[in-house]
Amino acid sequence: MLKREMNIADYDAELWQAMEQEKVRQEEHIELIASENYTSPRVMQAQGSQLTNKYAEGYPGKRYYGGCEYVDVVEQLAIDRAKELFGADYANVQPHSGSQANFAVYTALLQPGDTVLGMNLAQGGHLTHGSPVNFSGKLYNIIPYGIDESGKIDYDDMAKQAQEHKPKMIIGGFSAYSGIVDWAKMREIADSIGAYLFVDMAHVAGLIAAGVYPNPVPHAHVVTTTTHKTLAGPRGGLILAKGGSEELYKKLNSAVFPSAQGGPLMHVIAAKAVALKEAMEPEFKVYQQQVAKNAKAMVEVFLNRGYKVVSGGTENHLFLLDLVDKNLTGKEADAALGRANITVNKNSVPNDPKSPFVTSGIRIGSPAVTRRGFKEAEVKELAGWMCDVLDNINDDAVIERVKGKVLDICARFPVYA
């Protein structure tokens, strides 16, 4: 007989120590990586459930294994909630990650060698939008589009590239772009050449669910997202669509299973269902509104302290600091802030003279700090501390002083009570 109340600490002290150290790190560090967030205890409870034991290849009502009557209920709840939350009429909740979801879309809509128009990674795109080191860049002919001198997406250049190269698919979405994307304009460009519009909304899904950022679902042929990041659920992927054909939806389902994956992770799908329900609550909208307010408040401080923000501001949860004028690399800034218990990530900026392993910028996001209760006053104070560190990157006394302030505010705003 298996006893569920057993403690890992009693069995595997070495592993438990690492887990406990990570728990302490999360409580004692300020998390500003834009793609990270804190999920709820309810989500973690679902993800740690006995559903992990069940194989369920196939889809609700059409499984290859017996004993799926209850996991069918779980998956259907997740599907229905995803469709309701984002205004879709199709949802696949099985992708293990956002990259897996994107791979399924490529598989369903394209053939290897087809031409794809995607956002340049160096100007805000994502690995799966055509990076040469990713499957997308290896299997498909990628034509990049980017941003103009003001830091906004260059739709004129996008349209020109579309007419010249006639891609079969245009990708919208980003991993480091702080503006509003005109999904309708992108669909217009796609329609002008008979291309698919595929949107990866992973970074802004939570903002979209709360009505804080424009929803691409009514405009795109297919939309993908992660279920963590701003959505604050478990790590996983999701595919959505509206107004498509049954043939398209069958292709998408087949591209997930059996093409790319086998058995779905039913414990994670249950956790997705919980997170999607949480995203329908009124307090989730308040949270997402605060995420956007906090990002803007931080930008204001950095600009006032003489730092360059790419595109001059933010309309979502993230922004990039361009450190070229400060003669700092992103790697140096990342390390110095880390010594003060502030976690960011180095990030390339437009026309970056440094390699992707060094970079000339850092990416900053507000979802996690907002989740632990920070509002404008706290994030403005935090941004000021960050400027103190970046202004005195080799001054250990300044960094230690900021670290002390970070530890104090983290104690006042715990992640988990």
UniProtKB/Swiss-Prot annotation:
This protein's UniProt keywords: Amino-acid biosynthesis, Cytoplasm, One-carbon metabolism, Pyridoxal phosphate, Transferase
Function of the molecule: Catalyzes the reversible interconversion of serine and glycine with tetrahydrofolate (THF) serving as the one-carbon carrier. This reaction serves as the major source of one-carbon groups required for the biosynthesis of purines, thymidylate, methionine, and other important biomolecules. Also exhibits THF-independent aldolase activity toward beta-hydroxyamino acids, producing glycine and aldehydes, via a retro-aldol mechanism.
Catalytic activity: (6R)-5,10-methylene-5,6,7,8-tetrahydrofolate + glycine + H2O = (6S)-5,6,7,8-tetrahydrofolate + L-serine
High-level lineage: Bacteria, Pseudomonadati, Pseudomonadota, Gammaproteobacteria, Enterobacterales
GO biological process: glycine biosynthetic process from serine; tetrahydrofolate interconversion
Species the sequence originates in: Klebsiella pneumoniae subsp. pneumoniae (strain ATCC 700721 / MGH 78578)
Stored Pfam families: SHMT
Translocase as UniProt keyword: no
Compartment(s): Cytoplasm
Positions annotated to bind (6S)-5,6,7,8-tetrahydrofolate: L121, G125, H126, L127, S355, P356, F357
Protein name per Swiss-Prot or TrEMBL: Serine hydroxymethyltransferase
Superkingdom to which the source organism belongs: Bacteria
Molecular function terms from GO: glycine hydroxymethyltransferase activity; pyridoxal phosphate binding
Cofactors: pyridoxal 5'-phosphate
UniProt subunit comment: Homodimer.
Transmembrane regions listed in the UniProt entry: none
